[in-house]
A protein has these predicted regions:
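Intrinsically disordered, low-complexity regions enriched in Ser/Pro/Gly/Gln/His and often acidic
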Residues: 1-4, 104, 122-125, 199, ...
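RNase H-like nuclease fold core
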Residues: 1-61, 68, 72-73, 80
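Alpha-helix boundary/capping detector
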Residues: 17, 88, 100, 200-204, ...
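Short, charged/polar low-complexity linear motifs in solvent-exposed/disordered segments
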Residues: 19, 26-27, 44-46, 112-113, ...
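Short, solvent-exposed secondary-structure capping/transition elements
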Residues: 25-28, 103, 214-215
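Conserved structured core elements
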Residues: 37-40, 64, 168, 196, ...
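Extended amphipathic alpha-helical interaction segments
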Residues: 48, 54-63, 70-195, 252
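Basic, amphipathic alpha-helical segments enriched in Lys/Arg and hydrophobic/aromatic residues
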Residues: 180-253
């Protein structure tokens, strides 16, 4: 999953292109703008680091919101990747404009679309949603629903990758944690380069931080995001585990 979070560096707003999987940050950087070229550079850091580890690395799919520059950046970095449009982002604005029973009906039909297991089923449910809309909705809400239904080609590819995420809320959870840290420090105060190092340090700390007592009590087998993703840890002390994992066997020292 991939998304960008806005933040500030000594006043001007910047974007933080972030790649997430398995509850861990896989890539994070800072770019001055959210256009295609800048995001290609930002997400390109993840691509370079992944290929340094596995030269033939190529993700099968990525789930993003509808921002064109994000999707185009990933298409340029990985030409054969399957781009999955986040269904949650597609309906949030619709949800905000509906109330009462009508809101329930709209969300029920959106849920049916999201649960489709094949391309054909997804296309059929989008078509039925589009047919239902003119007789039950009007104005801006109707146009928003029909606009989503017309993007059938962006939603159906998820059926080609059964393991692909259909929503990007997993990346939102990590970005929200990072945003709370940035807010507590009143954002960044020096340069884009130092801000990049700061968000990468935050990402590392998240990946290796030990879970709290309540989670460990309820799920004793879980230790940290790193352990969840890899199924092991190098050392029971989280800081030692971070230092060993990031040492690249001494090659990075």
């Amino acid at each position: 999953m991939a998304d960008e979070k806005g933040t500030w560096v000594a006043g001007p707003e910047v974007d933080v292109p972030t790649t997430v999987a398995g509850g861990c940050f896989l890539g994070v950087s800072v770019v001055a703008t959210a256009d295609t070229a800048a995001l290609e550079t930002g997400y390109g850091e993840f691509a370079q680091e992944a290929r340094a580890l596995a030269p033939t690395y190529h993700p099968r799919s990525v789930c993003t919101d509808g921002w064109h520059a994000t999707r185009e950046a990933w298409r340029r970095l990985f030409p054969t990747i399957t781009l999955v449009l986040c269904f949650l982002h597609a309906i949030l604005k619709i949800q905000d404009r509906c109330t009462g029973a009508l809101r329930h009906q709209v969300l029920e039909r959106a849920w049916q679309v999201s649960q489709a297991t094949t391309k054909r089923q997804c296309a059929q449910r989008l078509r039925r949603w589009a047919e239902w809309t003119p007789t039950h909705l009007s104005g801006a809400v109707a146009e928003m629903v029909l606009k989503r239904c017309r993007r059938r080609a962006d939603f159906t590819p998820a059926s080609d990758c059964p393991q692909a995420h259909r929503t990007s809320n997993a990346v939102d959870r990590l970005l929200n944690d990072q945003d709370r840290v940035l807010d507590a420090m009143r954002y960044c105060h020096a340069t884009t380069a130092s801000a990049r190092l700061a968000v990468r340090a935050m990402a590392l700390q998240w990946n290796f931080h030990p879970y709290g007592a309540r989670l460990r009590r309820d799920q004793p087998s879980r230790v940290s995001p790193f352990h969840d993703l890899n199924g092991f840890q190098y050392h029971p002390n989280w800081l030692h585990n971070l230092l060993i994992a990031s040492s690249m066997g001494g090659l990075g020292l």
